Amino acid sequence: MKSLVKAKKEPGIWMQDIPVPEYGVNDVLIKIKRTAICGTDIHIYSWDEWAQATIPVPMTVGHEFYGEIVEVGKEVQGLKVGQRVSGEGHITCGFCRNCRAGKRHLCRNTLGVGVNRPGCFAEYLALPATNVIALPDNITEEQAAILDPFGNAAHCALAFDVVGEDVLITGAGPIGIMAAAIVRHIGARHVVITDVNDHRLELARKMGVSRAVNVKYQKLSDVANELGMLEGFDVGLEMSGNPMALNDMMKAMNHGGHVALLGIPPQETPIDWNQVIFKGLVIKGIYGREMFETWYKMIAMLQSGLNISPVITHNFPVDEYQHAFQIMASGQSGKVILNW
């Protein structure tokens, strides 16, 4: 089958013909229809320090997908051939303390699809049935292909009560933009998103934010004053991994505010702990998606009218994957889809 493989320990990804994966009695085999490129895939392509330390070579990459079930393991119940599906890309152990307590997103033994085990940038994917998400008919193929990052956004955006609150989002990448759409959909008052990329800030405006702010040219304090905010932001969602953005967020928070951290810093990050302590801030780290409460909620939000389609800016046939990766890496895009 056709597959995109990290075949060499150097920058690049290669299209190769490899065998269709075998599937076990508790697995399903999925015919891949659409996939989306993630920032993780860009790290793997560029072969940066994280990728070199993490990715076994060779490895079929990719973890964001939509497809249809073509084979079902003999012990699988509740799924059938022909169903439209996406899936949770974190494979958990089932026996650690958190798994046994129903908190699988905190499994210490997690394996990532397309990172630690073969991924979805291929014509077929074998996946444990417990990780497969059957989709209702009113979820489009493109939406289904980006449910994984939409789930990151939902997990973060739903970490704290945002109804009637003023929300600051630092980082206008696709996940930050989708988080902005979510908090607006569920009832936040002012939603402010910051970045230094004008293309992505314009995309955020299309998703309904109150203000999209280029912090190279405008201060957060001025924006808050213009919006009539007298006491700072109630909820902060840090999506950028940028140390300066994190500390700017701490300064902009109201006393008693809540901060969710999803962005991954490139190195150890100094924090002004006086802002945290004297303001009584609550900080929560966010990783992946709650299994499977986040999935239920994000599908329900799409069914209730939340539109995330504007974040999808490019579609390419898989044979043009090199150009697709270049577009994604340029920062001049939202989500980029590969059609199989």
From Swiss-Prot:
Q: Name one Pfam family in it.
A: ADH_N
InterPro entries in alphabetical order: ADH-like_C, ADH-like_N, ADH_Zn_CS, GroES-like_sf, L-Threonine_3-DHase, NAD(P)-bd_dom_sf, PKS_ER, Zn_alcohol_dh
Q: Which reaction is the catalytic activity of this chain? A: L-threonine + NAD(+) = (2S)-2-amino-3-oxobutanoate + NADH + H(+)
Could you tell me where this protein is found in the cell?
Answer: Cytoplasm
Q: Does the keyword Iron apply?
A: no
Pathway(s) this gene product operates in, as recorded in its UniProt entry: Amino-acid degradation; L-threonine degradation via oxydo-reductase pathway; glycine from L-threonine: step 1/2
* Binding residue positions for Zn(2+) 2: C93, C96, C99, C107
Q: Name one GO cellular component term.
A: cytoplasm
Write down how the cofactor binds this protein: Binds 2 Zn(2+) ions per subunit.
Query: Could you confirm whether the keyword Metal-binding appears in this record?
Result: yes
Residues annotated as binding NAD(+) are I175, D195, R200, L262, G263, I264, I286, Y287
How does the record describe its quaternary structure?
Homotetramer.
Fetch the HAMAP family from UniProt. Thr_dehydrog (MF_00627)
Q: What is this protein called?
A: L-threonine 3-dehydrogenase
Q: Gene symbol? A: tdh
